[in-house]
Amino acid sequence: MAVGKNKRLSKGKKGVKKRTVDPFTRKDEYSVKAPSTFQIRDVGKTLVNRTSGLKNANDSLKGRIFEVSLADLQNDEDHAFRKVKLRVDEIQGKNCLTNFHGLDFTTDKLRSLVRKWQSLIEANVTVKTTDDYLLRLFAIAFTKRRPNQIKKTTYARSSQIRAIRKKMTEIMQREAASCSLAQLTHKLIPEVIGREIEKATQGIYPLQNVHIRKVKLLKAPKFDLGALLNLHGESTTDDKGQKVEREFKEQVLESV
C-alpha cells in the first residue's frame, strides 16, 4: 500500500462558507458642498474609510474631484450639456467644501454642433486670474449665413479665420485676467464670453454656437482657508479693520 496523504481526510466540510465582512460597515458618509456661485449647493454624498490609526479620513477626501452636470447645480435643463469639475479642498464636520476645478462639454453636444457647409474655428489661451489661478480656456465657434445669402455654403477664408481667432484670444484674455476665479465662474454660467466674441466678430464673419467648451485648471495658488470659507459663505470673521480713535496727549519732558 502506498504511503501518502489521505484525500478524504484533508477535505473540509461541504457547505461551510467563509464569513464575509461587509466593507461598507467601515465607511463614513460625507456631504459634498458646491461653492455659493451655484444655485444648488448640495452635490451629493461620498464614502470614505473611517479614520483608524495613522490613516485619516480627511486626508483621503482632500483632493477628490467630482464631475457634476451644470443643469443639476443651476436647476436648469438648458445647461445639461456642460459638466463642472469640483475639487474637495477642506473638510468641516461631515461636509466636504469644494472649489471650481474645470468645465467641459458632453461629447454628444460637441458632435451635434459639427455640420456640413460651415467653418469650424477653435482658439485657446492660457491666462492667470487676479487670485493667481492659472487656467487654459478653449473656445469653439461656427460660421453662419449672412442675411439674404443665397449660397448654401458659409466657408470663411483663412485670413478671416485668423482674424476671428485673434479676436477670440483677445476677449478670453481680457475677460479672464480681469477677475477672480469665482467671478469667472459667474461669467461662464450664462456664457457671457461667448456672446462677447459673437458681437466682436460680426464685422469679420457672422458666427453661431460660440462657446467656451472647456476650462482646464493648470495651477492653483497656495491654499487659503479664509478665501474658501468666503466662497462658501461660511466665514465668521470680519476681515475689515476698525478705526481706532485715541485722544492725543502731548508729552511734557520734565528734565532736559
Curated annotation (Swiss-Prot):
GO cellular component term of the entry, any: cytosolic small ribosomal subunit
Location(s) in or outside the cell: Cytoplasm
One Gene Ontology term from the biological process aspect of the record: translation
Record region (Disordered): 1-20
Lineage top rank: taxon: Eukaryota
Modified residues (N-acetylalanine): A2
Keywords: Acetylation, Cytoplasm, Ribonucleoprotein, Ribosomal protein
One MF term in the entry's GO annotations: structural constituent of ribosome
Basic residues bias spans: 1-18
Family, similarity comment: Belongs to the eukaryotic ribosomal protein eS1 family.
Subunit and interaction comment: Component of the small ribosomal subunit. Mature ribosomes consist of a small (40S) and a large (60S) subunit. The 40S subunit contains about 33 different proteins and 1 molecule of RNA (18S). The 60S subunit contains about 49 different proteins and 3 molecules of RNA (25S, 5.8S and 5S).
Protein's name according to its UniProt entry: Small ribosomal subunit protein eS1
This protein's encoding gene: rps1
